[in-house]
């Protein structure tokens, strides 16, 4: 399934085509063959996919390619901390999609607050740069699997 999701995302992003799973099998299989310099024909079929399924497949593909990631960081419960973390992400060219910040979990005002950030990256290298920037800023990031 994962290989079909990546093949689907490739077809949408690179060729602006919506192809259903039966048509994606050859595209996914070609990733495992040495076809460089050879003329290959892959028959693509079907576009019979509902919008909800398509959205889910695209999101799964973006997660697999490290284009969407979720990071948990611990911050102090004081004014300016949220801005500081957002600034670190912005300087690293990350784009915040969703933020989960709940300071009412603990009754101890001196306790750290967990901040869960879902963000966009350009791929694995960029994801690693963002995580490193958060580490360098003392945020102790932990990458967690995004939920859809």
Q: Where are the language model's segments positioned?
A:
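Catalytic phosphate/nucleotide-handling subdomain of diverse soluble enzymes
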Residues: 31-59
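Active-site-adjacent helical/loop segments in soluble small-molecule enzymes
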Residues: 1-38
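A conserved regulatory-domain signal marking ACT and ACT-like small-molecule sensing domains
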Residues: 51-148
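Short, surface-exposed loop/turn motifs that are enriched in glycine and acidic residues
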Residues: 15-19, 44, 74-75
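Histidine- and/or cysteine-centered catalytic micro-motif in compact active-site loops
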Residues: 1-2, 45-47, 76
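Short alpha-helical
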Residues: 3-6, 25, 49, 80, ...
């Amino acid at each position: 399934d994962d290989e079909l999701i990546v093949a689907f995302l490739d077809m949408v992003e690179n060729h602006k085509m919506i192809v259903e799973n039966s048509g994606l099998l050859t595209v996914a299989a070609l990733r495992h063959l040495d076809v460089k310099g050879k003329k290959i024909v892959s028959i693509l079929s079907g576009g019979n996919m509902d919008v909800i399924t398509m959205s889910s497949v695209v999101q799964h593909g973006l997660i697999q390619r490290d284009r969407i990631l979720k990071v948990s960081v611990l911050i102090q419960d004081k004014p300016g901390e949220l801005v500081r973390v957002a600034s670190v992400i912005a300087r690293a060219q990350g784009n915040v999609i969703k933020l989960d910040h709940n300071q009412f979990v603990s009754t101890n005002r001196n306790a750290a607050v967990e901040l869960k950030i879902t963000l966009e990256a350009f791929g694995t290298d960029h994801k690693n740069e963002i995580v490193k920037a958060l580490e360098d800023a003392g945020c102790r990031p932990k990458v967690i699997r995004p939920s859809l």
